[in-house]
């Protein structure tokens, strides 16, 4: 059973539920096409990571966004 975990830091209110559905469908279709997996067995999880819980270069994404 393929298990795919997508981690996103939401920006500007997104992703929307429709965009999440498109990601789930698109990633599942790609697994079928590239790895010949059974679509019914593919699990896709989308984790939305708060910008205070993710850092780059020693600073939180929240802090970096405030600087720009």
UniProtKB/Swiss-Prot annotation:
Active site residues per record: 2
MF term (GO), any: isomerase activity
Domain of life: Bacteria
UniProt source species: Helicobacter pylori (strain J99 / ATCC 700824) (Campylobacter pylori J99)
Similarity field: Belongs to the 4-oxalocrotonate tautomerase family.
Transferase in keyword set: no
One Pfam match: Tautomerase
Record protein name field: Probable tautomerase jhp_0858
Keywords in alphabetical order: Isomerase
InterPro entries (alphabetical): 4-OT, 4-OT-like_dom, Tautomerase/MIF_sf
Gene3D superfamilies linked to this entry: Macrophage Migration Inhibitory Factor
EC number in record: 5.3.2.-
């Amino acid at each position: 059973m393929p298990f795919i975990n997508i981690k996103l830091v939401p920006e500007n209110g997104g992703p929307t539920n429709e965009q999440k559905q498109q990601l789930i469908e698109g990633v599942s279709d790609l697994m079928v096409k590239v790895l010949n997996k059974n679509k019914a067995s593919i699990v896709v999880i989308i984790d939305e990571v708060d910008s205070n819980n993710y850092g780059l270069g020693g600073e939180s994404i929240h802090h970096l966004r405030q600087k720009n």
